[in-house]
Amino acid sequence: MPEGFPAGLVLIDKPAGISSFSAISRLRSVYGKKLGHAGTLDPFATGLLLVLTGRATRLASYLVGADKTYDATIQFGSRSTTEDPEGEIETSGVTTTEEAVRDALPELTGEIDQVPPAASAIHIDGERAYRRFRRGETVTVPTRRVLVHSFTLIHFDSDSQQATVSVRCGSGTYVRSLARDLGDLVGTGAYLTQLRRTEVGAFSVTDAMPPDTIAAAAAGACAWFPASTAVGGLQQRQLTAEERIIVGHGGRIAVDSNWVDDVALLDDMGDLIAIAAVDDGVAAPKIVLVPA
């Protein structure tokens, strides 16, 4: 890890037209080779990517399941084989109305059953679904339960048959599939033409920077956040100097007997030292970011 950037979190504003992995790889000159992520975006999509650096890559599981918020544009009257602009487009010629779209949205809100796209990263018999799809195979993706907190119509243009929407959803929800299903509900077919992720948990794209800007300007500090921000939802415990050494060696310490689940253990500067599992008033380190 380059000097000045310990384990932490980087917020990328991914541009359209590149893969998430390509965007992340452009940061290695700034943050070092050990980089991880907390969920990718499709190449056509833009917006917030959470990138973990150094030992903080071990914190990905605390971020992957966070709720996400998107702005999206949906094209009605057509269908796409990939449910986005990168697939083969078939036009139905059928139109819809703003009222019909608004009336259909509640059916795709709350806990719903969703069939993810065939061109997705879901594993089917040990292989990514999109690999089978690209080979021309018929891909049957199983239905799964997802949570859509809100699906809001921002604007509908009757001439272009395009709708701008905002979606806040739980992890594992495909906005592409929401667009497809909305098109089916109004009887026109539909696919996603634009997608921008604006929030992941407590993190916002307004605090992110494009990867090339970070790399070219050596502006790493502007987009870097300490590892403690990745686990801001956990209980926190500040360590004494003696406890800091014990935890750094993987040893256990006493904590509040009423605590359950995991706890973030911090030093006197607020830096994250470890994540520990708590049982009966004892915290046992499971991830040590800063060894003694």
Regions found by a protein language model. Name each.
Residues 1-41, 45, 66, 185-292:
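Accessory RNA 3′-end/elbow-binding domains used by RNA modification enzymes
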Residues 34-64, 131:
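Glycine/acidic-rich beta-strand-loop module
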Residues 33-38, 111-117:
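Active-site phosphate-binding and catalytic loops of NTP-dependent enzymes
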Residues 62-116:
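Acidic, low-complexity central loop/insert segments
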Residues 61-76, 139-153:
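Structural signature of FAD isoalloxazine-binding scaffolds in flavoprotein oxidoreductases
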Residues 128, 133, 162-206:
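Pseudouridine synthase
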Residues 26-32, 49-50, 138-172, 176-177, ...:
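The conserved catalytic core of RNA pseudouridine synthases
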